[in-house]
Each structure stands twice: as C-alpha cells, then as structure tokens.
Amino acid sequence: MPRALWPAWVWAIIILSMEGASDKASSLSCDPTGVCDGRSRSLNSIPSGLTAGVKSLDLSNNEITYVGNRDLQRCVNLKTLRLGANEIHTVEEDSFFHLRNLEYLDLSYNRLSNLSSSWFRSLYVLKFLNLLGNLYKTLGETSLFSHLPDLRTLKVGNSNSFTEIHEKDFTGLTFLEELEISAQNLQIYVPKSLKSIQNISHLILHLKQPVLLVDILVDIVSSLDCLELRDTNLHTFHFSEASISEMSTSVKKLIFRNVQFTDESFVEVVKLFNYVSGIVEVEFDDCTHDGIGDFRALSLDRIRHLGNVETLTIRKLHIPQFFLFQDLSSIYPLTGKVKRVTIENSKVFLVPCLLSQHLKSLEYLDLSENLMSEETLKNSACKDAWPFLQTLVLRQNRLKSLEKTGELLLTLKNLNNLDISKNNFLSMPETCQWPGKMKQLNLSSTKIRSLTQCLPQTLEILDVSNNNLDSFSLILPQLKELYISRNKLKTLPDASFLPVLSVMGISKNIINTFSKEQLDSFQQLKTLEAGGNNFICSCDFLSFTQGQQALGRVLVDWPDDYRCDSPSHVRGQRLQDARLSLSECHRAAVVSAACCALFLFLLLTGVLCHRFHGLWYMKIMWAWLQAKRKPRKAPRRDICYDAFVSYSERDSYWVENLMVQELEHFNPPFKLCLHKRDFIPGKWIIDNIIDSIEKSHKTIFVLSENFVKSEWCKYELDFSHFRLFDENNDAVILILLEPIDKKAIPQRFCKLRKIMNTKTYLEWPLDETQQEGFWLNLRAAIRS
C-alpha cells in the first residue's frame, strides 16, 4: 500500500470509531433518576460506558447475542435489568457478579440452551427472575436457585424443548408468590420436585397434556394457594381419588385458562372439587367445552355438591355444539352452596327457572355481555328463584324496557344492587316498580335522555353516566353517591334534592363554573369529581378555586383534570395555574379609574389650553388649512384692492374719515378694502377675511389698544400672520395709531413681535405738521 494512503486509512478508522462510540452513547436514553431505556434500538451488544448511576436498564427487543463479564461490572447500583426478546445465546459465568443490588432480572425469550447457577450466586436480593422462552431442556445439572433466598417470582420453561423437571431443580426455594412453568411438552416429572417449596401463592402451569398433572398436584396440593392451568387439553384427564384423598390440602382457587374439556373430563374436574376440600373459588376463562352437556351417563348424580366451592366464574366459554347442548339439569343439585356466579360473554340467553330455584345460597350473579332479554328474564327470575340474591349484573344484554325489567325483578325480595348498564332503554317511563330493598342502580350507557320518578326512592347509589341527560331534578332523599359523568349537564344538581349526598361524579359534562355557595349547599359532600368540563375561568371562579386550600381534599382529580376552556389566552391551562389581568378581574374599578383619568386629562387640557391659548392655535390651524387648500398667491389679475385695512371698530373714525379720505381721494387714488362696505353679505366672516386679504396687494393693520382687544382683528391678524410667514413676503403694513407696549401684543404672535423689533412701522404723529409726511410714507409703502 502506498505511503500516501496510510494517513487516510488512519483518519477513516478514527472517524468510524468515533461514530460507533456516538451510536452507542445515543442508543440509551437515561433520566436523572438513573432509569435507562434502550428498547428496540437494534443493538447487537450491551452499550459501553454504563456507570454506577444506572439503576434500571431496559435493553429488551434488540439483537444482543452475548453478555460478557465486563459489560455490567460498573453497574453496582443496578436494581432492574431487562434483557428479554434478544438473541442471547451466551452469558459468561461472572456477567452478573457485580450486580449485588439487583432485584429484577428478565432473560426471557432468548436462545439460552444451558443455564448456570454461577450467574446467580451473588444475586442475594433478587426478587424476580424470568427465564421463559429459551432453548434449554432442563434447569441444569445443579440447583439453579439455591443462592436466591429472597426470590418471590420465578418463570421458567418453554413451549417446545423443556421436557424434564427433576427433584433438585427448585431446591433452596421455600416461598414464592408466583411460579410459572411453561412445559407444554413435559415428558418427565420426578416426584417431589416441587415439594421442596414450602409455600406457593400462585402456580401457573402450561401443560399441553394432563398426563403428569395429578403427579404435580400431589406435590403441591398442601403448599399451594392458587393453581392456574393454561393451554391444556383435558380430553383424557382422569382423576384418581386415592392419590389425594388422605392428604391435607391448602388450594383455595383453581383457574382454567384456555383449557379444553369434554363431558367426561368435566366430571373428573368436578370430582377434584370434592376431594380438594379447600377450593372455594373456580374460574374458567376462554375455555372450550367439546360436549353436549350429557352428564347423566357419567355418574355425576353420585356427586352431591361442588365441595366447598362458593365462587364460580366463567368467561368466554366456547361450546362448538351449542345447539345440541342439553339443559344441564343433572348439575342443578350441585349448586346449592354456590354464593357468587359470574358467566360473562358466553352467549347465555336463559337461566332455567329450575336452576334459579336450586341456587338457594346465591348472593351475587353476573350475566354481563350475554343475550338476556325481558322474555327470558321472566323465566329466569321466576317465583322462588335466587331467594338470597343481593347483586344482579345484567350489563350489556338485550334489555329494552326499563319498566318491564323492574317489574320482572319484583320476585327478588333481597335484591339491593342492580346493574343494567349498556342496554338500549332509550327512555324512562314516569313510574316503575322495583324490589323493595333496592339501594344501588347502574343505568350508565343506556342512552336515556331524561330521568323521571321511575327511579326508586330507596336508592343510595345511582350511576347514570354516559347518557344524554341535560338536567337532574329528581328528589332522592337517601341518595349518598351520584355518578352522572359524560352527560350534557350545564350546572351542578340542586342540593335540596339530594340532602345526604356525599360522593358525586360529574366529570366531562358541559359545566362552565360552580361556586363556593353551591358546594357548601351539599352539607355532607366529601368527594367531588368534576374534571374534564368546559370551565369559563372568570375572576370569581379562579379566586374561589385558587383560594380554597381544602378544595383539593374534595376534588379527587384536582388539579390536573380541571382546565380552562375560555378566555382563549388561558385555554388548556389548569385552574390552579391560570392568571387573569387586572383589567379582566376589576373591570368596574378600571373603567372608573379610566373615566377619572380622562376627566382629569380633559380638565388639565382645558386649563392648559386656556393658559397657553390652545383654542387659538386650533382656530388658526383650521384657518391655515383652509387657506392651504387655495392657491398660495392669487394671480395678478385677481388683485382687486391696493390694501385691505384691518382695524378696530372703535378706531373706525380715524380710518374712515382720515385714511380713506387721504388715500382714495389722492391722485391717482388707492382702492382700499374695508369690512363694512366690501365684505360680501351672507358669506362666512372668516372666508370674507381670507378672500379680502388674498385679493389685496397689501394688508394694513391699524394697531391700537382697541385692536389688540378685538376678536375679529385677531382673526385678520392671524391669517395675515400665516400669509406673511408662509408666503415669505412683505404684504403687511403696520400703523401704530397710538403708543402701545409691545408686551401687550399676545405671545402667540411671535413672528409679528419679531417684525416689530426688526422692521420699521408707521407711527401716527399727533403733531399736525408731521402728518403730511406720514401719508407720504404710507402711500409709498402701499406702492412698494
């Protein structure tokens, strides 16, 4: 390789290594508490750089194949490690040696073909271990869990290759809360293999065939609380009385999940109930009965009862030969001690009257998600049926008439709790009949639009959630709990109708607000759920909700579910956090203050205008604007006068008898414009002044004390003032008729005062010998 290429190769290797390190670093997202998430990142190894700060590490659903001794050695504070759903086939002996604080370890669904006890020898505080779904055939040659004294949950086995359970496998385990064994292909079970475990709260067995089931039961029946059998075909199951009859049993509950029965194997299971006397609860979930219910030929009549079974639960029972199934009359006598029955989502459309009458101890019956209607309910709730029944659940069946349903249940004298939710009642009649002891009624999701006096007055708990109600105005004097969420209510119900109400759920309606007075009116209210409404966050409402510290103890969903819908600028904010401006909360005060401020402003403006002649400035501005709309200077042909004379009426004698005589009778004569004779009648005075000044070659101001005091003289002087300084000409002639103090001229005529200070003006002489010279100078000024 040429020497010149070596630097390029070195840089490429460095860059690739940096990118690899960057990818590793970015493969995990860790929060400040040390919880790191690396799920589904396509990782093929455990990320490097893990430190003692990591307390929880989730690397499930990746492509990791190998766990080395050094991969986790710095994670000394790790408590949770999830490595499930990877491709791990090798775990080195000391991979978990430094994880002495580990409490949760998941190695499920990998490719481990061998298990080693050395993996767990330092995990003294481990509580949860999942080894399901790997490839091992056995649990190893030595005791795998002997170093795990605190282990409480253990999951082992797989669905294919796990075939053997030996006596040593569970040595060292004395108490387990949950043990799950997946052994669909189990071929060898050495007796007493599970007997070493002194107590198991819940055992889950995945067995495909029941061949070894009885052997396992013999070992655990005295140490087990709950047995759950999954994915098992019990077609060939046969129960041997001799194997269990003389042993003390502790099993209290049996669960069959996804299990297949025949008529024969069902009878064998019923026998088991009799001999395992501690069983009080039996559950069938998603099971299949491959039979027609013909138990008479199977000696079922020899069995007098179901042992001590009090609770029977059946969910999603499949009967392929449903239309050939018999009436089950042979099992009626076995049901006398049963107190609680749940048959859910199993296509039940009828409980025969005779069976109902045999259920003499029944207190709770749940027939949810079935096909019960009023016609079949009439037969089921016949006379003497379910004499001690207290709770009946008929949720999501085919009931349509509320009136008829209540009437059919009158035979149930002890019924106090009825759930008929998710039926299509649509409406509620005005009156109904109900059992006399009714205290709880669930009518949620029944599409009713209004409530009537049909409801029993004895109710203590009522649920009418998720309907189309827009009001609640019923008087229920004994009602303690009301659930009316997901309706269309605009306000809280009237407290006088519900005097003893202590719990109310009214969330997700269209309530805009509620007040302290409303809440206080419910004198016994302890719990209110009102979140999810469209609250208008007014100042009063926010002040109430934010100022009541005790409100959080009443509102169970406070504060997260209480959010503003309006005003728009606080929409989505929690009531606790929303803030409104001062103007929104104290509008009257703000308007009053604004009015006062406006009044003071106008008053101050008036004073300032009076003091600094503001009105005059406005008038002169208007006159100036009017003048600006006309040509700046009239064409020469429009000049009609030699001079416009502005004077005070009190100086008219001097103007008319002296000035006019001297100028208009001179040869050649001057043509003067005087307001008395030349203003156009009917025309605005201000327009006359403007036109006269513009049509005059000069403007003569006869100044005197009277002139300064004259309002119209001021207007004439005002416009001339603008003309003088806007057109920048010398069209103004000042005649001082009598001596006046320059200070008497208003300050606003600053330009005029400046002219008087800088230019010569004509002063009328009192000496007659000098008057001829005055007229001579005036005529010369006009001609200039």
Swiss-Prot record:
Record cross-link Glycyl lysine isopeptide (Lys-Gly) (interchain with G-Cter in ubiquitin), residues: K754
Annotated site residues (Interaction with bacterial lipopeptide) in this chain: F349
Span of domain TIR: 639-782
Keyword Repressor: no
Top-level division of the source organism's lineage: Eukaryota
InterPro entries xrefs: Cys-rich_flank_reg_C, Leu-rich_rpt, Leu-rich_rpt_typical-subtyp, LRR_dom_sf, TIR_dom, Toll-like_receptor, Toll_tir_struct_dom_sf
Biological process annotations from GO: cellular response to diacyl bacterial lipopeptide; cellular response to triacyl bacterial lipopeptide; inflammatory response; innate immune response; toll-like receptor signaling pathway
Motif (ATG16L1-binding motif): 761-778
Record's subcellular location: Membrane; Cytoplasmic vesicle, Phagosome membrane; Membrane raft
Parts of the chain that traverse the membrane: 588-608
First-listed, main subcellular location of the protein, grouped into a coarse class: membrane
Disulphide connectivity of cysteines: C30-C36, C353-C382, C432-C454
Cytoplasmic side: 609-784
GO molecular function terms listed in the Swiss-Prot or TrEMBL record: NAD+ nucleosidase activity, cyclic ADP-ribose generating; transmembrane signaling receptor activity; triacyl lipopeptide binding
Recorded GO CC terms: Golgi apparatus; membrane raft; phagocytic vesicle membrane; plasma membrane; receptor complex
Glycosylated residues (UniProt): N114, N199, N442
Bilayer topology term: Single-pass type I membrane protein
Each LRR repeat, start to end: 54-77, 78-101, 102-125, 126-150, 151-175, 176-199, 200-223, 224-250, 251-278, 279-308, 309-337, 338-361, 362-388, 389-414, 415-437, 438-457, 458-478, 479-500, 501-524
SUPFAM superfamilies for this protein: L domain-like, Toll/Interleukin receptor TIR domain
Assembly: Interacts with LY96, TLR1 and TLR6 (via extracellular domain). TLR2 seems to exist in heterodimers with either TLR1 or TLR6 before stimulation by the ligand. The heterodimers form bigger oligomers in response to their corresponding ligands as well as further heterotypic associations with other receptors such as CD14 and/or CD36. Binds MYD88 (via TIR domain). Interacts with TICAM1. Interacts with CNPY3. Interacts with ATG16L1. Interacts with PPP1R11. Interacts with TICAM2. Interacts with TIRAP.
Entry's family note: Belongs to the Toll-like receptor family.
Protein function: Cooperates with LY96 to mediate the innate immune response to bacterial lipoproteins and other microbial cell wall components. Cooperates with TLR1 or TLR6 to mediate the innate immune response to bacterial lipoproteins or lipopeptides. Acts via MYD88 and TRAF6, leading to NF-kappa-B activation, cytokine secretion and the inflammatory response. May also promote apoptosis in response to lipoproteins.
Matches recorded under PANTHER family: TOLL-LIKE RECEPTOR (PTHR24365), TOLL-LIKE RECEPTOR 2 (PTHR24365:SF17)
Free-text domain note: Ester-bound lipid substrates are bound through a crevice formed between the LRR 11 and LRR 12.
Protein name: Toll-like receptor 2
Species the sequence originates in: Boselaphus tragocamelus (Nilgai)
Gene that this polypeptide is encoded by: TLR2
